[in-house]
Amino acid sequence: MPKRIAILGGPRCGKTTLIQQLYVDMKIRDLNVGVATEYSTDYLRDKGMIENISEQYGIYLGQLHLEESLNEFDYAITDYATFVPYIYGRFMLGDKKRTTKEIEILKDLYILALRDLPKYDHIFFVPREFGYTKDGVRWQDEEVAQAVDKAILSFLEAENVRYTTITGSTKERSEKILQILNLSKEIEPKDINLDMATKWLRIKN
């Protein structure tokens, strides 16, 4: 089974760009690494805004399928995690009075989240440092995105999950992660760049 690396943060915090950079930096070290971008982005693009908590089941299953497709690699990088649908489900409901069905769905998602947490070897949180620009897919504005950031952190802390906050430019963030993974040795540069990484990501997705 691969070492699983999850890069987490709210919408438009730079996590997808970071996994592209990290993927490149690991490939040029001749590491057997696979990457998958979050399933929910494709879901939102194809089906529109999520309106019901039950849709988080589909997000969970889609993300699980993506992550299982990386089992052949030594390292598996994602910018999401299968426990995040629970966080979003809880966030969607907010403080409103919950129906019996909503409570049961939230319980199911929580059980799945707790079951899946141990499979991640490294969890990194990416704080919002570069401002917020809408991408035409996600519905959240910056204020909501910041609230999602807090919801993710609250979950990690409430469940005593070990995670590392990664700051700096995209390149600096990637280098810090490599150091934590003990992969920061000097290497001979190869002709691989972020454009190539983006093409590989498109092929894999």
Locations of regions flagged by a protein language model:
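Conserved substrate/cofactor phosphate-moiety recognition/catalytic segment
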Residues: 23-65
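Hydrophobic anchor at the beta1->P-loop junction of P-loop NTPases
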Residues: 7
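Conserved lysine of the Walker
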Residues: 15
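Conserved nucleotide-sensing/catalytic segment adjacent to the nucleotide-binding pocket
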Residues: 48-97
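Walker A (P-loop) phosphate-binding loop of P-loop NTPases
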Residues: 12
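Hydrophobic positions on the alpha1 helix immediately C-terminal to the Walker A/P-loop
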Residues: 18
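A glycine- and Lys/Arg-enriched "phosphate-lid" helix/loop adjacent to the NTP-binding pocket
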Residues: 92-171, 176, 196
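Pre-Walker A (Motif I) flank of P-loop NTPase domains
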Residues: 1-4
